[in-house]
C-alpha cells in the first residue's frame, strides 16, 4: 500500500495533499477550521441533495413542499434542520478561518488568500439564494430588498434587476433560477476549494510563530488527521445539538408565514451571518454608496496583503496590533447586533460609527500600528 499510494496517479495526489504532506509541527487548533469547512461543505451538499429530491421550485407549492419534507418524508425534518443550521456552522467556521488568517498573517500567501475571498463571496451568494427557497415572508422580502440594490448601478441598474428577477417583480421565474443557482454553486465552491488547497500546498502552511518552519515539519497523517477528526466530531456534536434541541433558534419567525407580496414585514433582515454587512449597507443614506460599502466590506479583505508593512508575520509578538485586532472583532459583533435592530435612533448612529470604525481599522489603524512596531524593533 505504501508503494501504491506514492505511485498510483490518483492516490499520489491524495498522498501529497493529505498523508505525506509536510506540515509545521506547531500549528494549533485554529488551523482545524479548513478541514471543518470541507466537512460543512460535504454535509451541505448531501443534505441539500436529499432536500432537492422533494422540493418544488414553484411559488404556489414551494412553501408547502418544505412543510411536506418536514412532516411526511422519513427524517425530512432532520435533513432540513441539518441543512439550515449547517449553513450557520459553515459561516461560523468561515469567519473563524478568516479571523485566524488575519491574526496569524496568512494573507502574505496572496494567491491562497485571494482564492479564499472568492470562496467567501461565492458562499455568501449561495446562502442568499438558498434563503429565498422556502418562500416564506422573509425569504420573499429579503430577495426583493437585496436584488433591488442592483438598481443603484447607473444606466444598467433597472434592466439588470428585471433580468435577475425574470420579470417585473420577484416571482416564479426568480424562484426557479435561484434554485438552479443554489444547486450549482456548492460544486463551484468545491472546485475553488481544491484550487485554494493547490495554492496552499505550493507554499506550505503558515504557523502560529510566523517563522519559517521548513526545518521542523511532520507528516500530516497521522498527527493532523487525528486532530482534524476530533474537530469534526465536535462540529457534528454542536450541529446535532442545534438541529435536535434548538432547530429554529437562528431562523426568523416571519419565515413560518408563506410569502405575501401585499404584506411587508415590520423589519426586513437577512440571516445572522449577513447582519454585519447589512448594517454597513444601512448606515449610508445614499443607495449607491450603501451598495458600494456593502461590496467593499468583503473586498477590503484583499487590501490586507497590500497594506502589510510589518517586519513580522502574525500578531503573536505585536501587542499594539493585537489590541486593534480585538477592537476590530468587537466592532464586527456590534455591527452584527445593529444589523438585526430596527432603523431608528440610537441604532442608526451606532451603526454609522461602527461602519466607519470597520474601514478605519483596516485601512488606517493597522498600517500605522505596523509602522510603530517596526520602529520599536529598531530601538
From Swiss-Prot:
Pfam families: Cytochrom_B_C (PF00032), Cytochrome_B (PF00033). Heme b b566 binds at residues 97, 196. It is found in: Mitochondrion inner membrane. SUPFAM superfamilies: a domain/subunit of cytochrome bc1 complex (Ubiquinol-cytochrome c reductase) (SSF81648), Transmembrane di-heme cytochromes (SSF81342). InterPro entries: Cyt_b/b6_C, Cyt_b/b6_C_sf, Cyt_b/b6_N, Cytb/b6-like_sf, Cytochrome_b, Cytochrome_b_C_euk/bac, Cytochrome_b_N_euk/bac, Di-haem_cyt_TM. GO terms for cellular component: mitochondrial inner membrane; respiratory chain complex III. Gene3D superfamilies: Cytochrome Bc1 Complex, Chain C. One of its GO terms (biological process) is mitochondrial electron transport, ubiquinol to cytochrome c. Disulfide bonds: none annotated. One of its GO terms (molecular function) is ubiquinol-cytochrome-c reductase activity. Its main location: mitochondrion. Its cofactor is heme b. It is a multi-pass membrane protein. Binds 2 heme b groups non-covalently. A ubiquinone binds at residue 201. Heme b b562 binds at residues 83, 182. Component of the ubiquinol-cytochrome c reductase complex (complex III or cytochrome b-c1 complex) that is part of the mitochondrial respiratory chain. The b-c1 complex mediates electron transfer from ubiquinol to cytochrome c. Contributes to the generation of a proton gradient across the mitochondrial membrane that is then used for ATP synthesis. Belongs to the cytochrome b family. The cytochrome bc1 complex contains 11 subunits: 3 respiratory subunits (MT-CYB, CYC1 and UQCRFS1), 2 core proteins (UQCRC1 and UQCRC2) and 6 low-molecular weight proteins (UQCRH/QCR6, UQCRB/QCR7, UQCRQ/QCR8, UQCR10/QCR9, UQCR11/QCR10 and a cleavage product of UQCRFS1). This cytochrome bc1 complex then forms a dimer. Heme 1 (or BL or b562) is low-potential and absorbs at about 562 nm, and heme 2 (or BH or b566) is high-potential and absorbs at about 566 nm. This is Cytochrome b. The lineage of its organism: Eukaryota, Metazoa, Chordata, Craniata, Vertebrata. The gene is MT-CYB.
